[in-house]
Amino acid sequence: MVLFQFYICTFITFNYYKFVLKVDSSSRRLLVIGCGGRARIQRYLSGYKQIRYEQELITDALDQRARIQRYLSGYKQIRYEQELITRKNYGEILNKYLSSGDILLDLAYNLETRCLLKWCHDHQVCFINTSVELWEPFGEAYKNDPRLLTLYHRQMQLIEMQNDITWNQKGPTAILDHGCNPGLVSHFVKRALIDMAQYVLKQKGIQIVDSEKIKLENALKVKDYPQLAYLLGVKTIHISERDTQLTKDPKKVNEFVNTWSIEGFVEEGAAPAEMGWGTHEKNLPNGIYFHKQKEGPCNQVCLATNGINTWVRSWVPSGEIIGMVIRHGEAYGISKYLTIRNEDDNNNNDILYRPTVHYAYLPTDSAISSLIEFRMHNYQLQPKLRILNDDVIDGADEVGVLLLGGHYVSAWWTGSVLDIHQARKLVPGQNATTLQVAISLVAALTYCLKHPNEGICLPDDIDSEEILDICLPYLGTWVSKAANWPEENDKIRKDWQFTSFQVEN
């Protein structure tokens, strides 16, 4: 049995101002697990105007005091201790720090979501995380079938747990996959569909048959997002991201450099490429695997190749990119949420509409160099790891959703362009990437306080306007516009097939 060390970074007793949130949270406590790049959230929470601290306990498997010393010194109510979480003792540790009505925020990697989720459900504790995790993601049993390494497989395990007769269907709110991506990008999709529909009705209305125009207006009025995507003709959704943050300290030999959790990046990048599979897809890429029919929604496929070796063409506001199809939770959540079934039959095979959904990620130059070295070392992680932060001198993180193949608008991008200078003005001590994650987590915490009894939710299941109202002021330049991409004679435009986007590695 392999024991992983995880970081319990912050244990926070907090109040939200009643006049802001209209809820009484004075007795709630928040435990944050994790002290990597994502977990620098505590720096942001310490300064967030809607949160007032009374007590905070930070514990970690390692001595991380130096990383947050100014917060330990600046807030008298904060304590720091060291702790180790394993599959054997997680219940004991959670019992020590949490009780009914509290919130657990899990930012660690390889800390099994099912275990934490079940404990929180049984103890009436709300739960938030940024990804669905396992204790041992690369066990021997997974080697013969890449489908067992997918996030889809993990989601099916969660569904199986919820279908058990001992599970109360509602219970405390648990928001899964709510970082930036997965997380915010699900809310970006909804905003993109609204903006795109309004643009089409205003600018392209003369091209639309009256009956279709009425349908589009009705779907817009009631915010029926699957119908909007279907009526607009959206065939593919890229979660397109380019990170151009530049360090003054170049990557060294045998060092992995990134702007966020390196261990998390390597784990998901080395896993099979995974995507939501659209109903318009006719051409099958090499090495494709389908999931067994009638076992879940069957909205995803995976490839035999891993994510960091699967590349596609995509686009962000700064221009065309080539990005990696790394597995991400939003590919499951968005494609499932936008699925439309024939009304007379709920059979898994009887799907009227679903878009293809996947990540297209181009990280920093430092991270690209690190990945090349990682591959050169036969996928063994470098001995030195470094997360870029104060050493970043320029650059931005462009992350959004690219809706492609529409009847009236061929491409529409909605998302955040946050440069390092904007990020530092908003919250000192953050890079652009961690701030985009941090504010999403704050929004999820706020949602939990206002809606504490909604059971298990993906980002697609909760009110996007509530989330975006909090997040938009911290996302830098907000973009939601038609994109002139690809060019008219590009092969992609012929039928918007996944294989047309693919690039030889």
Would you name each region that the model predicts?
Residues 85-96:
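Conserved Rossmann-fold cofactor-binding substructure of NAD(P)-dependent oxidoreductases
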Residues 6-27:
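A short, basic/flexible loop-to-alpha-helix module at the beginning of a structural domain
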Residues 131-170:
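Rossmann-fold NAD(P)-binding glycine/threonine-rich loop
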Residues 38:
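Hydrophobic/small residue at the entry helix of a nucleotide-binding pocket
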Residues 195-505:
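C-terminal catalytic/substrate-binding lobe primarily of soluble NAD(P)-dependent oxidoreductases
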Residues 76-87:
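Rossmann-fold cofactor-recognition segment
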Residues 109-110, 119-143:
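ADP-ribose/adenylate-binding Rossmann-like module
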Residues 32-34:
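Conserved N-terminal Rossmann-fold NAD(P)-binding element of oxidoreductases
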